[in-house]
Amino acid sequence: MSYFEGKTVLVTGAATGVGEGVAQRLYQAGATVFISGRQLEQVKKTAYTIDPTGEKVIALQADMTSPEQVKSMFETILAQTGALHGLVNNAGITGPHNTSIVDYNIDDWKAVMDTDINGVFYGLKYGIPALLRSGGGSIVNLSSTNGIVGIAGISAYTAAKHAVLGITRSAALEFAHQGIRVNAIGPGYVDTPRMQQLPNEVRQWMASTHPMKRMATRKEVANMVAFLLSDESSFSTGAFYAVDGGYTAQ
């Protein structure tokens, strides 16, 4: 029997992209998966696509920049299932590209920080008590290759993803003795439906930045998340796992 049979996991920002791929992977492994996003109709559509029965993939509306909504989301999950065993803090935005720090709009900066690091903080703040109530569990925070290297022109995203790694390590140390593991993953460019809409020359450039000369698939990222959520990684916490085709090894 799969580790995920009888387990409940929340994936934030799962209406599309990597989050959707993670939710599908966990559902296929036997988990009950709650998926959240800002636009409920899109989240419901994704949930139905993954699980037409509506029994094991449940859509929730939550803006991760709102602590009240995040808290309510966890309360809803516990009210419906009585337990939460895994959390994937995936929700995030990139913000402006090719923009110097001196030209970066302050509101844009705040928006990236509010989603990409405050949202992770809220997820941990209200998610960890839910995991403790369930006897412990595993958390995977989505950082990025930008979480351990600097890239010019995308300073807010880079700063936020570095911060995700920092809070991951702090949370891992705080709760290691209580049966909660916290890790971060750092994908490179992932071949999501949104990426597939980009001009071919842009896609080729993205692929070329990885030594393996291609982009990651959503399944490859989801497989790493599933590994870190499962007991297969039971002695791993506070770590960063690259899924980047060798990018950060350069």
Where are these regions (language model features)?
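The beta1-alpha1 cofactor-binding region of Rossmann-like NAD(H)/NADP(H)-dependent oxidoreductases
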Residues: L40, Q61-M73, I106, K219-E220
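Substrate-binding pocket helix/loop in short-chain dehydrogenase/reductase
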Residues: N98-I101, N105-K110, M195, M206
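Catalytic Tyr-X3-Lys loop
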Residues: V102-F121, V140, V164, M212
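Residue(s) in the substrate-gating loop at a strand-loop-helix junction
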Residues: S144
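C-terminal substrate-recognition "lid" of short-chain dehydrogenase/reductases
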Residues: Y3, L124, R214-V243, Y247-T248
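Conserved glycine-rich cofactor-binding loop
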Residues: T8, A15-G17, Q39
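Alpha-helical segment proximal to the catalytic Tyr-Lys
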Residues: P129, L173-H177, S234
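Active-site helix of classical SDR
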Residues: L124, A160, T168
